[in-house]
Swiss-Prot record:
GO biological process: L-leucine biosynthetic process
PROSITE patterns linked to this entry: ACONITASE_1, ACONITASE_2
HAMAP family from the UniProt entry: LeuC_type1
Protein's name according to its UniProt entry: 3-isopropylmalate dehydratase large subunit
Organism phylogeny: Bacteria, Pseudomonadati, Pseudomonadota, Gammaproteobacteria, Enterobacterales
Protein function: Catalyzes the isomerization between 2-isopropylmalate and 3-isopropylmalate, via the formation of 2-isopropylmaleate.
Length: 466
């Protein structure tokens, strides 16, 4: 029987499946951070249980770390306690930890791939909704809750029901300057923010194959934003070349044997999907969200939509509410919307290619008066690579702030946040009310688009910036 990639991955990891019961899956990698793990470790301690597979468990600090200092006290008492607990728990249970002073420290979904912890064919979980990022490697990766974190720590397994399958094919080639972020925003603009609910999505088509691994990570990172359980891209030579030589990747003959297996991780000819969505890459332009869910997205050259133009009464009401919160009027050109802050970072867009794209726009220009612009590398290695290439100097000379690695302004859990009423061009992944700070107004864009907003003071089409 022909199988989809998702079905192959799922079936290969079933430990036990009784009739009329939820299957038990084996988990190959468990990624841990400071926010969703303390209670899980407390649960182990209370029952006298060890971590079953510490060698398959990797921890880092990211969510509430300061991006201005490595001082553990910088972001308040709750952050300090969570980080201290992670240090204590990892030491007690034998889990490898990349703490604030470790050269590999960074956002968990940046750290995993760059260290070769993430490999094709694996099941990967983390107490974080954007674990879908790792699906870019042809791995089944999804976020879990704290009680599930404890279960995986204790058993290296997890009960999971089978999801429905969705194929999203982006046909043809994207135009120059169109990034994975634009592609995925255009996809969600078509499906809506709940279009993938109950599904695992496989992204395919020429435009997807053309993406680098970093682009594919951006794509899969945001599968959750259309309601999907996970996102997948089948592994290919791009994947194998990225993985080869990384710290935790197989070496020598083991790598060759692994690649031979990884090449089987493709959807079979004749396999069927529950849902199929198709887009034409050439029709995708630079995207900007205007509302408070990711389905509320338009081309940078469009006008803010009129709620009256929505036939669906629920969509109309949602648009009215979003415009009121965002402080926008229908009909005004998006390029006339001024911004207060710019955030380039997050598990969506903080890798070296993202920083290069932003630096290309920033080079020789200055951040507009009254705009605060932050560049937050996703990890220690990304920061070091950017500095080796001189990107930090480009940003600093242009008036951007060059920060330490962390989740930063993606979410209001540290010192980097919006004040009420402030408008931000952000490369992160969520734009709901208060995500970046109470009363903050978030517009999601690609790194180059964020840099363009920083230097012009408003949204601007990067294709017009010479």
């Amino acid at each position: 029987m022909a199988k989809t990639l998702y079905e192959k991955l799922f079936d290969a990891h079933v430990v036990y499946e009784a009739e009329n019961e939820t299957p038990l899956l084996y988990i190959d990698r468990h990624l841990v951070h400071e926010v969703t793990s303390p209670q899980a470790f407390d649960g182990l301690r209370a029952h006298g249980r060890p971590v079953r597979q510490p060698g398959k468990t990797f921890a880092t600090m990211d969510h509430n770390v300061s991006t201005q200092t490595k001082d553990i006290n910088a972001c308040g008492e709750m952050a300090r306690i969570q980080m201290q607990e992670l240090i204590k728990n990892c030491k007690e249970f034998g889990v490898e930890l990349y703490d604030l002073n470790h050269p590999y420290q960074g956002i968990v979904h940046v750290m995993g791939p760059e260290q070769g912890v993430t490999l094709p064919g694996m099941t990967i979980v983390c107490g974080d909704s954007h674990t879908a990022t790792h699906g870019a490697f042809g791995a089944l990766a999804f976020g879990i809750g704290t009680s599930e974190v404890e279960h995986v720590l204790a058993t290296q397994t997890l009960k999971q029901g089978r999801a429905k399958t969705m194929k999203i094919e982006v046909q043809g080639k994207a135009a120059p300057g169109i990034t994975a972020k634009d592609i995925v925003l255009a996809i969600i603009g078509k499906t809506g923010s709940a279009g993938g609910t109950g599904h695992v999505v496989e992204f395919c088509g020429e435009a997807i194959r053309d993406l680098s691994m970093e682009g594919r990570m951006t794509l899969c990172n945001m599968a959750i934003e259309m309601g999907a359980k996970a996102g997948l891209v089948a592994p290919d030579e791009t994947t194998f070349n990225y993985v080869k030589g990384r710290l935790h990747a197989p070496k020598g003959k083991d790598f060759d044997d692994a690649v031979a297996y990884w090449k089987t991780l493709q959807t079979d000819e004749g396999a069927t999907f529950d849902t199929v969505v198709t887009l034409q890459a050439e029709e995708i332009s630079p995207q900007v969200t205007w509302g408070t869910n990711l389905g509320q997205v338009i081309s940078v050259n469009d006008n803010i939509p009129d709620p009256a133009s929505f036939a669906d009464p629920v969509e109309r009401a949602s648009a009215e509410k979003a415009l009121a919160y965002m402080g926008l009027k229908p009909g005004i050109p998006l390029t006339e919307v001024a911004i207060d802050k710019v955030f380039i970072g997050s598990c969506t867009n903080s890798r070296i290619e993202d920083l290069r794209a932003a630096a290309e726009i920033a080079k020789g220009r200055k951040v507009a008066p009254g705009v605060q612009a932050l560049v937050v590398p996703g990890s220690g290695p990304v920061k070091a690579q950017a500095e080796a290439e001189g990107l930090d100097k480009i940003f600093i000379e242009a008036g951007f702030e060059w920060r330490l690695p962390g989740c930063s302004m993606c979410l209001a859990m540290n010192n980097d946040r919006l004040n009420p009423g402030e408008r931000c061009a952000s490369t992160s992944n969520r734009n709901f009310e208060g995500r970046q700070g109470r009363g903050g107004r978030t517009h999601l864009v690609s790194p180059a688009m964020a840099a363009a907003a920083a230097v012009t003071g408003h949204f601007a089409d990067i294709r017009n910036i010479k």
